[in-house]
Amino acid sequence: MASANALSSASVLCSSRQSKLGGGNQQQGQRVSYNKRTIRRFSVRANVKEIAFDQHSRAALQAGIDKLADCVGLTLGPRGRNVVLDEFGSPKVVNDGVTIARAIELPNAMENAGAALIREVASKTNDSAGDGTTTASILAREIIKHGLLSVTSGANPVSLKRGIDKTVQGLIEELQKKARPVKGRDDIRAVASISAGNDDLIGSMIADAIDKVGPDGVLSIESSSSFETTVEVEEGMEIDRGYISPQFVTNPEKLLAEFENARVLITDQKITAIKDIIPILEKTTQLRAPLLIIAEDVTGEALATLVVNKLRGVLNVVAVKAPGFGERRKAMLQDIAILTGAEYLAMDMSLLVENATIDQLGIARKVTISKDSTTLIADAASKDELQARIAQLKKELFETDSVYDSEKLAERIAKLSGGVAVIKVGAATETELEDRKLRIEDAKNATFAAIEEGIVPGGGAALVHLSTVIPAIKETFEDADERLGADIVQKALLSPAALIAQNAGVEGEVVVEKIMFSDWENGYNAMTDTYENLFEAGVIDPAKVTRCALQNAASVAGMVLTTQAIVVDKPKPKAPAAAAPEGLMV
């Protein structure tokens, strides 16, 4: 039967041509020959392309790069201007370089390819440092502009790129030597204020938040329903699981279960039989200590007995489900165990709940449990063990490539090391709210970058001072085109400071020349129109932001300089509009 079905199916699939060819065979014994197969050919047709070579391709790229960089450059410095973006809904007024870059699409496909390269610079800098996107865009534009002029004049683009890369590497080493570590709250406030567009209120707010949660803490930014911007600090470790039963509530008005100096039992096992935890319940009752049970689940007889005895006043207990899932659940339970000084009773290690002793319980100074969350405030039993755990998580954070894993690891580090600060941003209008949130996000990122790698003079002064080191770096190059690459970087380093001065209404070249012949700490303060010690004036930038801007600009510029052709989709001609019906006025 199966073969008959197979035959009938195959017969249906035969083409008409096969039927004709096999006609004679069918008459002789009704046999069908499948030796000849129809080969179905298919082809993939690409869109029509437009191709440009040499000078024409370079000119198109440069035009697109200039348009985007000019628009982004308007925002640079304390006296930079805003840009209005007409997007969905009401227009946005923004001062953030990467937001502007991402919003720009040029109608000419070849020019848009150039603009896309600057978008890449801005995005990469934003991802790696969180700020400095405008500086990176301006640096990239200048390196590309001078580099393309040299290529047109006959320089070898590969040698130029090699010279640029070597020079940038030497500058980064010099930058790391010159960077100064962050010294206290004033430096943090100054970095945050500068990054937020010289907004001292935002700078003070970021400094206050970091004072409370520490350098390993997490700053989260949310919209507020009021006009005011406030900082709220969530002290201790918070997990996103609440009490299993509302009968555990101790504060009926707020629907919270609140304990002080509670013992903590931590396990990944499911507790269903009350006999498994009777020894622990008896011990904690004798100690007159409340008990917090964090387990995979507490159900059946165990839950019913706990609830009944809680209502009768015999037990002071609350049960909470373990947070997370799978391997992440185990890791989070281990974090809680280290924080409270408990022993993690893991099933795979044969540490059963029924064999638990009072010494395996942790202690939480304060526990607050709602229906959705649990907050634990504890003094770590072993500071060394806690620091080792934080160091391990930092190592994992450094090695991971996953954005999701990075967020979760940073969250766990914050919970172990101090807490989470939430900045609730308020404003009078939606447009102002969006701009304010972007500024605070930049300030937050710049602050953590400064804590990580130190600070340098702001206002583009650090780049101008670094340009004076290039002649010494250039002397080590034997190839003439590589030395030309070093000269290109030297010219480009002057552009951010010149543009900041220009946006402040001052002649850029004059400012750059004065900075160049001053000490490392000195530069031009565009806000006050004075030349002064920028560290003392609070005009400082994170060294990491400067480094990432320079590296990413050089990387993309090198790719452009070694480009010889552009291939883009040819725009399709628009269909003519339909003629209006006769007698109808349009």
From Swiss-Prot:
Gene induction: Up-regulated by light.
Location in the cell: Plastid, Chloroplast
GO cellular component, one term: chloroplast envelope
Top-level taxon in the UniProt lineage: Eukaryota
Modified residues (Phosphoserine): 90
SUPFAM superfamilies given in the database record: GroEL apical domain-like, GroEL equatorial domain-like, GroEL-intermediate domain like
One MF term in the entry's GO annotations: ATP binding
Protein name as annotated: Chaperonin 60 subunit alpha 1, chloroplastic
Lineage start: Eukaryota, Viridiplantae, Streptophyta, Embryophyta, Tracheophyta
Gene name tied to this protein: CPN60A1
